[in-house]
Amino acid sequence: SGEWSEEGDRLFKNTDTNGRFHSDWCSMIYSRLLLARNLLTDDGVIFISIDDNEQENLKKCCDEVFGARNFIAQIAWEKVHTRKNSAINFSSSHEYILCYAKVRRNYSGDTAGFKRNLLPRDNTDAYSNPDNDPKGPWKTDPITAHNYYAADYTITKPNGVVIKRPQDRYWAYSEDTMKRMIAENAIVWGEGNSMPLAKRYLCDVQDGLVPVTLFSREFAGDSSQAKKQIDSLFEECKGVFDYTKPVKLITRLLQIGSNPEDIVLDFFSGSATTAHAVMQLNAEDGGRRKFIMVQLPEKCDEASEAYKAGYKNICEIGKERIRRAGEK
């Protein structure tokens, strides 16, 4: 760009009109990925947000730096939920989050490398204990399935009605397992000739939920929620920062990838959403996570609300957000 920093370093702006745009972007991100890998502990993990423009290039860079064997997941995050009718082709509604481990665990018995956490279970209201079952709260599941699981047999209900499997379904349990469940009072018989149901006990399910690769706005927030969050912190200058991530999204990633004593590094920290999420999650689960935020002091546009409010560069916005979020 022809500009120079106060230290005498040449500043370069990579625009899409530059003939080497993608190559320059890859060079920029590659060096940062190498540094990130060196900073990760053996059980560490990295999450990288990216859109369609560089997703393919980022995946190749990550495969080379971390090794394709250490790829964990590519998450699709619902960034916006409204349709953009002015779009020429498709209205884009999502971004990606690539996840790589320093060392990936391939089997449940592995003890070295990254171990993802289960997400908190928030649907326990579906479980109850109307019959005072000694195993505790339960909910019902079908005893039949679409796919073949067990050989054919009949079930005799306490009222004498004989139940056969439906023609288009199969038993979900073997006959021996069904007999054991009946003996353990783990079957809900129902009235008349209705199909019995199996009890699924809350004590038998996992302590949490396995994360999936689709993050809906209800699960992880979206860009409109992110804007409302930062505007609520900077009420005197709404619109202080564009393109920020929702705290809920980063919190979900922290729940999956971090432990209570971990150090979280964000080297594109922007408005410091990651720091905000770390503090919020610590308050929720009693953790003592620490954060390191890295951001170049990019100047704010003089016409922007941030500049008018006295913030000369992005770092000043991030530091003030950390202070204000910490007070809440």
Question: Residue spans of the language-model regions?
Answer:
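A phosphate-binding catalytic loop at a beta-strand-loop-alpha-helix junction
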Residues: D262-L281
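PRPP-dependent phosphoribosyltransferase catalytic core
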Residues: Q280-K328
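Class I S-adenosyl-L-methionine
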Residues: S1-I263, D285-R288, L296-S304
